[in-house]
C-alpha cells in the first residue's frame, strides 16, 4: 500500500518559515514535518510514498536526493576525490516526488499522481503539514470493513483560547482551552 502526501501548498500561515522552503519541510525536533509523517506511516508498515509537490518542490526533491549523505557518517578525501561511508542509516522508503503545480487544488494533485497509484486497490492520503497520533492501521481496517469509496478521519478540535469565568467584574476562575463548539472537522487522514 502507498501513502500519497499533499505537499504543494503555499504555506501562507507559516510565512516566516516558508519563504525559503515548503511547509512540509519546516523542522520539528530537527527533522522536517514530512519526515515525521512518513515515520508514522512506516510504523504501520507503509513505506511507499507519492509526494505531491508544488511550491518550492525542488527543496523536497533535494532533501531526498541527499538523504543518504545527510544521514550517514562520511570521510571526504579531497586530494583523492574519494568518499568513505562509515555508518549508513536508511529508511525502508520508496519515494516518488511529483510536481503537481504551484496553484493546483487537491483533486488536481490526485489526478496528476493517478498513474502512480492506479495499480493499487487502495491508498492512504494525508496533508504534508500535520503530525498526528492517528492509528493508521485501524483506519485502513475500518475502510476495508465498510467497503466505501473513501474513509476520512474526523475530529472535534478544542477551543482556540483559554476562557475566563467572570462574576461581574471579577475573575472567578480560568479554564484552559475548553471544548470547542462540538463541530466535527476533517482530521486530514484518508483511505481511498
Which residues does each PLM region occupy?
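Short mixed-charge
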Residues: 64-93
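Short beta-strand-to-loop acidic/aromatic patch adjacent to the donor-nucleotide binding site
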Residues: 120-131
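Conserved core of the sugar-phosphate nucleotidyltransferase
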Residues: 64, 132-192
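N-terminal glycine-rich phosphate-binding loop and ensuing alpha1 helix
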Residues: 1-66
